[in-house]
């Protein structure tokens, strides 16, 4: 079962058993809370024997010495604490949680010599613990061969810090962020037989409880709007498509909205241009962009963000039945532009093209950002350490890059240009949906650019980061929830009134 934590913050606390976590900076002679947890000063000797120096994310796990009110003590290094940023506190919390899988009661002492602890730092530490502890086990009926699944009580965690009032306030926001990330992870991890377009739309509809206005457009309504590109992808599946429009109105009425658009291919076989069988199961995650947008809208509403925001997700399934679109078909998008389908596995851009045009045409937002697990080519270029960033606006691109540095959901800016635009010209239509093997992620972005007019726009290709990324202190899950924290930081730093 995944570990659930129940947090409280206190200026002082004497553990009554359980695990005491003591933070220690590199080079410091004493850890946080040592006077309480180690009254006979035994830990310094244990640290010397264990060669524990306070290096960032290093730990030393010991049975509590005589006289300690705790049963077990974990020393947690935070490195050179003067340079700790938000992400460092998150990772420290994640590293602590990784050592505490079997704990029933935890006390964390943050205020160590040489460490400046703000309320936000304390809240980030707690969020880091939650992010590390997340796991998706909805369909596991047994823990092991002989142990039945049981309901687990939350582990009580007391965080000891002088910044109690600020920490409690900051933790409310941190919890909202965590909820959005976990929602995105849940959606990506769900199997496609459970989460089709209709079911995904229903999950998004639940955001109404937080004050988000949610509209769900049916196939018939999209047909009336002329969304031939999106509907062409969907026509091979027996499961009807949906377009979900989410609005959070937390800003002033006169303020233009910021808009986020997500690709939501709930399962991608490739269609008639079918994918190889090996690894196709991962294509349940081809809706990672839509998951991130839905998670972001949850965050903005839950923390009452002072911004007007729009989230639009195009939900389809790409299947190869007798009514599926074929290579060589020509479809007409909502914009009126025609598209020759060269490869039915280049379907995400067709979905996004109509969604982007619809968003711009109806809402006229101040900016649009789309997220999509769009191309394997971006993984060839950047592996799974960075997402690709494409933009027609330098200011927006710089804001996104800065948000990526804060959250460590990192972006790398890629080019756009007329040379690439020519690669998607078609002999039979206004454009074709693939430009060939070379520059595949760039030509995909160039395709999307034809649907945004002059609106400041950015495209995030998250194919390498939304799912299957290497696990770390903050993510032990296949679905990462990439993009939720990044875009929340973007909004927080630049667009809240």
UniProtKB/Swiss-Prot annotation:
Q: Which GO terms describe its molecular function?
A: manganese ion binding; metalloaminopeptidase activity
User: Its domain of life?
Assistant: Bacteria
Keywords of the record? Aminopeptidase, Cytoplasm, Hydrolase, Manganese, Metal-binding, Protease
What GO biological process, any one, is recorded here? proteolysis
Q: What class of enzyme is it?
A: hydrolase
Its EC number is 3.4.11.1, 3.4.11.10
> How does the cofactor attach, per the note?
Binds 2 manganese ions per subunit.
Reply yes or no: does the keyword Cytoplasm apply: yes
Positions with a binding annotation for Mn(2+) 1:
268, 345, 347
Compartments where located: Cytoplasm
Which reaction does this enzyme catalyse, per its entry? Answer: Release of an N-terminal amino acid, Xaa-|-Yaa-, in which Xaa is preferably Leu, but may be other amino acids including Pro although not Arg or Lys, and Yaa may be Pro. Amino acid amides and methyl esters are also readily hydrolyzed, but rates on arylamides are exceedingly low; Release of an N-terminal amino acid, preferentially leucine, but not glutamic or aspartic acids
InterPro entries associated with the record: Leucine_aapep/pepB, Macro_dom-like, Peptidase_M17_C, Peptidase_M17_leu_NH2_pept, Peptidase_M17_N
Catalytic residues, per the record, are 275, 349
**A Pfam family annotated for this UniProt entry:** Peptidase_M17
Q: Which CDD domains match?
A: Peptidase_M17
Tell me which GO cellular component terms the UniProt record holds: cytoplasm
Where, in this chain's numbering, is Mn(2+) 2 bound?
Answer: 263, 268, 286, 347
Family of the protein in this entry: Belongs to the peptidase M17 family.
The record, for HAMAP family, names:
Cytosol_peptidase_M17
Task performed by this protein: Presumably involved in the processing and regular turnover of intracellular proteins. Catalyzes the removal of unsubstituted N-terminal amino acids from various peptides.
Q: What is this protein called?
A: Probable cytosol aminopeptidase
- Species, as recorded: Sinorhizobium medicae (strain WSM419) (Ensifer medicae)
Instruction: Give the encoding gene's name.
Output: pepA
């Amino acid at each position: 079962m995944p570990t659930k934590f129940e947090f409280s913050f206190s200026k002082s606390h004497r553990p009554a058993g359980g695990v005491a976590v003591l933070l220690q900076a590199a080079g410091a002679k004493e850890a946080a809370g040592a006077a309480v947890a180690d009254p006979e000063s035994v830990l310094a000797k244990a640290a010397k024997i264990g060669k524990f120096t306070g290096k960032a994310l290093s730990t030393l796990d010991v049975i509590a010495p005589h006289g300690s009110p705790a049963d077990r003590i974990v020393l947690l290094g935070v490195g050179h604490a003067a340079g700790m940023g938000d992400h460092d506190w998150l990772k420290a919390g994640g590293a602590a949680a990784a050592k505490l899988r079997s704990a029933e009661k935890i006390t964390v002492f943050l205020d160590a010599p040489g460490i400046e602890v703000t309320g936000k730092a304390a809240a980030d530490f707690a969020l880091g613990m939650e992010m590390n502890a997340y796991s998706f086990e909805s369909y596991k009926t047994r823990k092991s061969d002989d142990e039945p699944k049981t309901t687990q009580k939350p582990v009580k965690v007391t965080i000891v810090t002088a910044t109690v009032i600020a920490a409690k306030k900051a933790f409310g926001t941190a919890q909202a962020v965590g909820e959005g990330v976990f929602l995105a992870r849940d959606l990506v991890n769900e199997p496609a037989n459970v989460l089709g377009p209709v079911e995904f739309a229903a999950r998004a509809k639940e955001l109404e409880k937080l004050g988000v206005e949610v509209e769900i457009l049916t196939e018939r309504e999209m047909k009336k709007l002329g969304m031939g590109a999106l509907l062409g992808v969907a026509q091979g599946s027996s499961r009807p498509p949906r377009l979900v429009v989410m609005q959070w109105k937390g800003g002033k009425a006169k303020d233009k909205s910021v808009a986020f658009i997500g690709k939501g291919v709930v399962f991608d076989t490739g269609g008639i241009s079918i994918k190889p069988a090996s690894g196709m199961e991962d294509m349940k995650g081809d809706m990672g962009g839509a998951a991130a947008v839905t998670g972001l809208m949850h965050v903005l509403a839950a923390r009452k963000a002072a911004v007007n925001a729009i989230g639009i997700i195009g939900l389809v399934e790409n299947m190869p039945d007798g009514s599926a679109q074929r290579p060589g078909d020509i479809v007409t998008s909502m914009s009126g532009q025609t598209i020759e389908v060269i490869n039915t596995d280049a379907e995400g851009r067709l979905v996004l093209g109509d969604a982007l045009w619809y968003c711009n045409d109806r809402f006229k937002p101040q900016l649009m950002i789309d997220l999509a697990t769009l191309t394997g080519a971006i993984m060839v270029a950047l592996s799974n350490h960075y997402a690709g960033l494409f933009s027609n606006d330098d200011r927006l691109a710089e804001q996104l890059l800065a948000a990526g540095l804060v959250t460590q959901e990192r972006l790398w800016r890629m080019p756009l240009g007329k040379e690439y635009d020519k690669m998607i010209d078609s002999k039979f239509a206004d454009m074709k949906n693939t430009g060939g093997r070379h520059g595949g992620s760039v030509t995909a972005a160039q395709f999307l650019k034809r649907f945004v007019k002059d609106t400041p726009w950015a495209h995030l290709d998250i194919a390498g980061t939304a799912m299957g990324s290497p696990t770390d202190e903050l993510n032990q899950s296949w679905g990462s929830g990439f993009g939720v924290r990044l875009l929340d930081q973007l909004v927080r730093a630049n667009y809240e009134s």
